[in-house]
Each structure stands twice: as structure tokens, then as C-alpha cells.
Amino acid sequence: MEDIYKLIDDINLQKLDHLDTRVNEALTSNNDDALFILGETLYNFGLTPQGLEVFRTLYHKYPDESELLIYFIEGLMSENQTDEALEYLNQVELSPEKLMLEADLYQQINMTEVAIDKLTEARELEPNDPIIHFALAELLYFDGQYLRATREYEVVLDTGEYEINGINLFSRMADCALQSGNYSDAIQLFDEISEDEMISDDFFKKAIAYEKNDLTQEAIKIMTTLLSKDPDFIQGYFYLQSLYENEKNYPDAIETGKEGLRLNQFYKELMVSTGSLEIEHGDANEGVELLKKALEVDNAYHEPLLILSDLFRQEEDYEAIISLLSYVDRKSVV
């Protein structure tokens, strides 16, 4: 008989020869504790088909064990065996665990409203379980039901938890407020998060909330902090540039664009915005070159073509207009 613990050690060492055969041998063992560890190990290493068979065997032995049901159903869902997962769940007595698994399953097959209904039912069975409230809040959040999501996040916060699975609840609630147009509430909620706990998206969204409240200078400070902490947050350069432009601070707007382009030479939208600013408020020749580079990156990108065409027409530079034809993607104009 296969030594299960030796098999577990070999999996940890990535010694996977004859794995299917060895797992099948292990399934004949009566050491269920070792089999459970084997199933977990297989899942942890992404060996889901083999892990699924381990948990199938254990679940058939102990059908009343909710933990085994969870592992088994999650394995079926990972293998896209949703019909079989539903069949098993239909045979299980009503419980919060069953309803949460059904919610996961329906979410996986894009039946979000059914998933929300399942979690709502689970919440009624266990009204004080913060995990159920959080799971429901997350579904509502990603479904764009921000006010309902906020109420669920608030319930979790009332338990003393402000972070679950690495997700900051103040961040989620702040984004809900932002997406709902409650910009003052969004600022207050973002301000509850210390900078050390904020991720790049938090800084970005916080800046948007300040801008929406006509606090553009504060938004600029937030974006400057973000880019100093995470210079690879490339879309931040485009947004910070627009903030400077709104304040008519064209030199800083142009420099921000150039800084972003030094990090990503193929960011065509930033090429166009920076090029346009150069033409209007800086070095027009540099601006023209940036717009041409945008066309080299994507010759089906019409915006730089239109800007250059208008510019050359105003200057009556007909040779330059003709030269633009070399950038035209003929397939896009047929």
C-alpha cells in the first residue's frame, strides 16, 4: 500500500512521477487523517483533479462533515463540473455552508442575482456571521449595488473587523461612496485609512474623490505621493497630467507626461495628451513628434492623425498633410 506521508513529502518536493497511480493506491487506505492532508496538499500545488478524487472518497465516507463538503464542491467547481456540484448540493440539508457554496457556484456561472439570493438566505440563518455579511457585501459591490454593499460592510465593521482576506473595509466603503457620487463621504472614508495600509488604487480613487469635491490641489498632492510610492502605476501619470492641465499648470502637465513616457514608451494616450499640450503650450516640434510616435505605435489610432491634420491645415503645410498618409492603416479606412 502507498505510504501516504511519503507521497505528501514527494509532492512537496515536486516528485510527481506516477502521481495518478500513487494517489489511487492511497485511496485504499483507512488513514483518513492522512488522506485529508494529502487532499489539501494536492490542492495547494494546483493538482486539483487528483485532490478532488481524494475529497470525493472522504466525502462519500463522511457525508455529514461540512468541511469535506466544502473541499469536495470547491474541487468540482475548479474543474468546471458545475452540474455535478449542483447535484450533490441538492442532496445536502439546508445550512449556511451549503448556501455559501451554492452562491460561489452560481457566481462562477454568472448568475449573480441567484448568488446574492443564496447569501441573503445564509445571512438569515446566521445573522451574526461577519464572513457571510462580507461575502454578500463583495457580491453586491462587484454587481454595482453600492448602497446595499455599504450596509453589509458596516455590519462587519460593527464586529470590530476592518480587514478581511486582505481587503480593507474602509477602502471598499469609500469606493462605494465614490461610485455612488457621494464624494464627501468617500473622502471621509479614505481618510480613515493610514497611508501605510493604502494600496495604489486607494490613492488613485482618493484623488478622484478630492477632485470631484473641487479640491484639485489636494488631489495633485495625493497623486504625487502615489507616484513616488509606486512609479509604475502608469495610468496615474495620465490622471495627474489632467489635474495639472485643469489648473492651467502646463509645464508640470507636460513634464508629468514625459515622466510617464520614460517608463512606458508605448502609452499612446499619454503620447497624444502630452503632444497636444506641447503644441499648445510648449515645444510644438516635440509635440508633433510625440503625435507621430503615437501613430507609429498604432496606425489605426485616429486622434493623433486628426490633431496633426488640423495643425498642418492651419499652417498650410500640405506636404506634411500628404506625409501623414504613410501612417494611415488602409484597412481601417476601407
Could you say what each language-model-derived stretch is?
Residues 37, 71, 101-104, 135, ...:
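Canonical tetratricopeptide repeat
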Residues 31-34, 66-67, 96-100, 130-131, ...:
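Helix-start (N-cap) detector for alpha-helical repeat units in TPR-like alpha-solenoids
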Residues 13-17, 48, 82, 112, ...:
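TPR-repeat structural position
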Residues 25-26, 57-58, 88-92, 121-122, ...:
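Canonical positions in the second alpha-helix
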Residues 332-334:
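Conserved small/polar residues in nucleotide/adenosyl-binding loops
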Residues 12, 44, 78, 108, ...:
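Register position in tetratricopeptide repeats
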